[in-house]
Amino acid sequence: MARGGRLGLALGLLLALVLALRAKPTVRKERVVRPDSELGERPPEDNQSFQYDHEAFLGKEDSKTFDQLSPDESKERLGKIVDRIDSDGDGLVTTEELKLWIKRVQKRYIYDNVAKVWKDYDRDKDEKISWEEYKQATYGYYLGNPAEFHDSSDHHTFKKMLPRDERRFKASDLDGDLTATREEFTAFLHPEEFEHMKEIVVLETLEDIDKNGDGFVDQDEYIADMFSHEDNGPEPDWVLSEREQFNDFRDLNKDGKLDKDEIRHWILPQDYDHAQAEARHLVYESDKNKDEMLTKEEILDNWNMFVGSQATNYGEDLTKNHDEL
């Protein structure tokens, strides 16, 4: 492979790593939370749905660890987790108890993710990450060797991402010292989890989808973000449904395009609680006697759904010792 080819491959891998470490909005299913109307409507054998539940109950990063366990081992360890979820020890898991557990799992995943990458950026080991440290760790080679990027497609990507990262870093830096504490760096990597970062999430989403640069998202841009029309055939039914969603529910003022407020309403709905929705879904699917609470037996009878949900951090909690949970 020629030197230029190797460089392009290396830069591509570097960029993929940079983007993987960040929490910016990307594809369709990362932008849109699942509406309540979908809960309880999917068939039990839907493996994709099970994966969603597993990620909710266990944690996305570690769901693959569930594959290490036999069904009997999974049920045994899941039973121990159920005892932790049942905070009042009455033998019944309520939707509220399940919701609080899922929120705990979500929060732990986020902070574990930050801990994994912290040392890569905290070069001077002072328990803070300055903007300069982050910039050098992420873009140092690009900044030091601009000529190598001049004619590559990566040049435009890095040139765009650097100021965007700086803008997000400054938004997360509440005291304005251009140095991030762990909490501030968590807000930088996971802005969707912090109220003061919501405007950045909206702005970055707009920039990602608004291809003609007019400051709005029209219907074609909205569809292009989730569907690549590579041939001249008819659009799938789900795309036609999304066009209807755009017209009926996304475009609130009916001007044919989405402004920032409409984008915010779309990707960050104020009346939607993900953990509450997932907890309701798990109860709905497992509550055999329809008393709106779950016994340990009901959960273990539907173990395959739970070990694939955020409540067990996608299986990670099943491989941990009891004291770690």
UniProtKB/Swiss-Prot annotation:
One Gene Ontology CC term in the entry: endoplasmic reticulum lumen
Transmembrane portions of the chain: none
Binding site for Ca(2+) 2: D122, D124, D126, K128, E133
Record carries keyword Kinase: no
Family: Belongs to the CREC family.
PANTHER family: RETICULOCALBIN, RETICULOCALBIN-1
Protein name: Reticulocalbin-1
Biological classification of the source: Eukaryota, Metazoa, Chordata, Craniata, Vertebrata
